[in-house]
Curated annotation (Swiss-Prot):
One of the GO biological process terms: NAD biosynthetic process
GO cellular component: cytoplasm
Name listed for the protein in its UniProt record: Probable nicotinate-nucleotide pyrophosphorylase [carboxylating]
MF terms (GO), sorted A to Z: nicotinate-nucleotide diphosphorylase (carboxylating) activity
Subunit field text: Hexamer formed by 3 homodimers.
Source species: Methanocaldococcus jannaschii (strain ATCC 43067 / DSM 2661 / JAL-1 / JCM 10045 / NBRC 100440) (Methanococcus jannaschii)
NCBIfam families from the UniProt entry: nadC (TIGR00078)
Length: 283
């Protein structure tokens, strides 16, 4: 299903890229020329999206041989292919753009997850919905391949009460309304921006509490309040921290006894992996 979705995205992207035709290739390369080539990772990476690219190439008659699977660390050749030279050159940039981007997300996620778990083996590193339009399912798949958590995919996955909901009805009323109107099968998460809102979320027994934009020292104070509430009531929610968290400061947050660290940077600030498509033989 995800492969089918990726193929639709790739074909639509190709349609835009080609326009009325690849005038460079068509003016230089004669019809009927066959070529063989490789896609090469020019830096170590976690491969992601290779099956999407194989499906894309094969849709246009290009035969492929995978050298690595999604989730594997790679360097050098990751895919071999052969077929019509004009077609290969037409597909090149569209294929590379997606493969480089998804592999970049998987690689960055993998690196950050390892850092976080070095100080807190139980913590989950999750992405957010700060994704590119139409690419969100693929970007979240890349986070998963890198060892991260996808968080909610869509608005119908769980209740997530954010600052603008709170601005209208307040923390307590928002949680009460969600419990009244949403199926018991859906967890209720609330984003809190200060200790007052935290206490209100605890009192209403939110399933998940997100400490949003809390500084490390504020997280420590919040956890004391949560622990005290647990001692009194035997209730403890899942604790998520989010806001301003990047690779260079992840350890400042992971050292605390939190369950989830969510990072928009996993999808909105990722560096693509350096890759190339090289023709190695033609006839």
């Amino acid at each position: 299903m995800l492969k089918d979705y990726a193929l639709k995205i790739l074909k639509k992207s190709l349609e835009y890229d080609v326009g009325f035709g690849d005038i460079t290739t068509n003016s230089i390369i004669p019809e009927g020329v066959k070529a063989k080539g490789v896609i090469k990772a020019k830096e170590k990476c976690i491969v992601c999206g290779i099956d999407f690219i194989v499906a894309f190439f094969e849709e246009y008659g290009i035969k492929c041989k995978k050298l690595f699977n999604d989730g594997e660390e790679a360097y050098g050749n990751i895919l071999e292919f052969e077929g019509d030279a004009r077609t290969i050159l037409m597909l090149e940039r569209t294929a590379l753009n997606l493969l480089m981007h998804l592999s970049g997300i998987a690689t960055m996620t993998n690196r950050i997850v390892k850092k976080a778990k070095s100080v807190n083996k139980n913590v989950r590193v999750a992405c957010t919905r700060k994704t590119l339009p139409l690419l969100s399912p693929l970007q979240k798949y890349a986070v998963y391949i890198g060892g991260g958590d996808t968080h909610r995919f869509r608005l119908d996955d769980c209740v997530l009460i954010k600052d603008n909901h709170i601005a209208i009805v307040g923390v307590k009323e928002a949680i009460r309304r969600a419990k009244e109107n949403v199926s018991f099968t859906k967890k209720i998460e609330v984003e809190v921006s200060n200790l007052k809102e935290l206490r209100e979320a605890l009192e209403e027994r939110a399933d998940i509490i997100m400490l949003d934009n809390f500084k490390p020292e504020e997280i420590e104070e919040a956890l004391k309040i949560i622990d005290e509430f647990e001692r009194k009531t035997n209730f403890k929610p899942i604790i998520e921290v989010s806001g301003g968290i990047k690779e260079d400061n992840i350890l400042e947050y992971a050292k605390y006894n939190v369950d989830v660290i969510s990072m928009g940077a996993l999808t909105h600030s990722v560096k693509s992996v350096d890759m190339s498509l090289d023709i190695v033989r033609y006839q």
